[in-house]
Amino acid sequence: SSWWAHVEMGPPDPILGVTEAYKRDTNSKKMNLGVGAYRDDNGKPYVLPSVRKAEAQIAAKNLDKEYLPIGGLAEFCKASAELALGENSEALKSGRYVTVQSISGTGALRIGANFLQRFFKFSRDVFLPKPSWGNHTPIFRDAGLQLHAYRYYDPKTCGFDVTGALEDISKIPQQSIILLHACAHNPTGVDPRPEQWKEIATLVKKNNLFAFFDMAYQGFASGDGNKDAWAVRYFIEQGINVCLCQSYAKNMGLYGERVGAFTMVCKDADEAKRVESQLKILIRPLYSNPPLNGARIASTILTSPDLRKQWLQEVKGMADRIISMRTQLVSNLKKEGSSHSWQHIADQIGMFCFTGLKPEQVERLTKEFSIYMTKDGRISVAGVTSGNVGYLAHAIHQVTK
């Protein structure tokens, strides 16, 4: 008998499964609304011109390929913390933070989860919004933490369940961990408004919860990086010492380069140094040190004034295209004569939209119209273009009328 006779076939990844089925479809009108990557208005992958310029500058320098330190490229870490917390952040100025480079957002989450598993002595309990990004559960679970949920999305309004969220958060046991999406909540596209964030912060402070922020879409949600980081900065201003995961996959289009950062805001600079030493001890047996190329690209963009300015315009361009596709989809549904209210599609923010379509309607869209999405009715608005938005609206109307 074999060593691995007892190993069962695992379930396929639900999102990658959508892409596989899409690839097999021969219909010329087919649409893939499952994939979490930006597409231009011709439906093609998009490399930001600022990224191309940064790559050219890096290539011209003929740099070596030596190892980075365990914590990553120093100037990248500093620039990432400034981008997230704001250049005038008191936490930055007083040096009471530590930022390490990570293998994109997933790697940052896992480093954070591993650190909590080892050093957060108060609780094993992590509370995720319901629903949350599918990968959050295995990341925290595999790091040895216990998962729970708090209400977040209201299927009746396709919006934020503020009453349910505040009620559930108020009942979370003291000194537990709460995960918060900083902006462009994935998968729902539903974010709290600033006044609602203030109420959440009050409860987090009152219950002495540890706030764990995941910010995968800074700049990509509203088109304004400062606006998208508002909640994180507000929490820190309120004296809540958070940790934060950043990803440059979406906002710089550096998906396959795996560029991210993990930041811990501490009580003082001495605590930050101690935390940093332990983060390095966790990282070393995971992957020794992070990859070089993507961090160089991001760092070059963030630290050169001209490139940074160009990049901010390009991020706004991507965000604006997505916002415009949302409004076009809503107006096309009205044109089709749909009697349903689709306003939530325009109200939600970021790459993803929770349409409110039921699993059987999703199935019909795939079978009858070759439109692919996950069963929960989540669509990637990045897959919608001015060329196919009319077809999508027609198809949605057909399965919902």
From Swiss-Prot:
It is found in: Mitochondrion matrix; Cell membrane. It is an enzyme of class 2 (transferase). PROSITE patterns: AA_TRANSFER_CLASS_1. The modification N6-acetyllysine is found at residues 30, 44, 53, 61, 78, 93, 130, 156, 205, 250, 267, 273, 280, 309, 316, 334-335, 358, 367, 375. The modification N6-succinyllysine is found at K44, K61, K78, K93, K130, K156, K198, K267, K280, K309, K334, K367, K375. The modification Phosphothreonine is found at T19. The modification 3'-nitrotyrosine is found at Y67. It catalyses: L-aspartate + 2-oxoglutarate = oxaloacetate + L-glutamate; L-kynurenine + 2-oxoglutarate = kynurenate + L-glutamate + H2O. Transmembrane segments: none annotated. Its main location: mitochondrion. GO terms for biological process: 2-oxoglutarate metabolic process; aspartate catabolic process; aspartate metabolic process; biosynthetic process; glutamate metabolic process; lipid transport. It comes from the Eukaryota. The modification N6-(pyridoxal phosphate)lysine is found at K250. The modification Phosphotyrosine is found at Y67. Homodimer. Catalyzes the irreversible transamination of the L-tryptophan metabolite L-kynurenine to form kynurenic acid (KA). As a member of the malate-aspartate shuttle, it has a key role in the intracellular NAD(H) redox balance. Is important for metabolite exchange between mitochondria and cytosol, and for amino acid metabolism. Facilitates cellular uptake of long-chain free fatty acids. In eukaryotes there are cytoplasmic, mitochondrial and chloroplastic isozymes. This is Aspartate aminotransferase, mitochondrial.
